[in-house]
Amino acid sequence: RDPARDLNPFVLYTTRPIRSGEQDGREYFFVDEKRLSELREAGKIIEERMYSTVQGPWYYFTADDGQIDLAKHDYLGIGTLESYLKLKAYFGEQAMVPLYVEVDDGLRLSRALERERKQTEPKYAEMCRRFLADCEDFTEEKIAEAGIVRRFSNNSTPEDCFSEIQNFVEQQKKL
């Protein structure tokens, strides 16, 4: 969170196991399928995706849990093209500015492998599945269909990329 820029994290939910170095409520809210069912029954699910992983089904979802107050703050979140389109439908196009962060495939795979090696029990098959699924989910055609035109390169440092994003968001707020 950067108070000077009023850019707050928008944290999604997942049923996947927490990885080494992650913190509940920072990268994701880590919940079980029972909690997901409760949120479904309460009508709180904005969007939901299920991935058939090597370890079984994992759900990623966005819930209307009160963390978003568009009248007071701007938010930065991570998601797929599918989740972006559903969030845009829920909050309204005027509330959403897509920021597409792209990374060279070789670098993305290298970073994923480095991250996976640090896990207590690395799951390389799942890492490969995720990489290939992302290649399918983020084709140029699908990016264009989602109406995303602005891209940010994350081929150098994450700090450089985030600084570029912050500057872009500031310019958008002035429009």
Where are these regions (language model features)?
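Short beta-strand-centered segment that lines the nucleotide-binding/catalytic pocket of NTP-utilizing
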Residues: D2-R19
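Conserved catalytic network of the ASCE P-loop NTPase/AAA+ motor domain
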Residues: G21, G66-A71, A89-Q94, K142-A144
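Switch/connector loops and helix/strand junctions flanking conserved nucleotide-binding motifs
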Residues: R19-S20, L85-L87, G106-A112, D160-S163
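Hydrophobic/aromatic beta-strand patches that form the interior of the parallel beta-sheet core
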Residues: F10, F29, V97-L99, R150-F152
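Conserved phosphate-donor/acceptor-positioning beta-strand/loop module used by diverse small-molecule
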Residues: D74-T80, F91-E116
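Small-molecule kinase domains that catalyze NTP-dependent phosphoryl transfer to phosphate-bearing small molecules
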Residues: R117-Q172
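ATP-dependent small-molecule kinase phosphotransfer cores
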Residues: T14-Y75, G79-L81
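Short glycine-/polar-rich loops that comprise or flank the Walker A/P-loop
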Residues: R5-L7, G92-V97, E145-V149
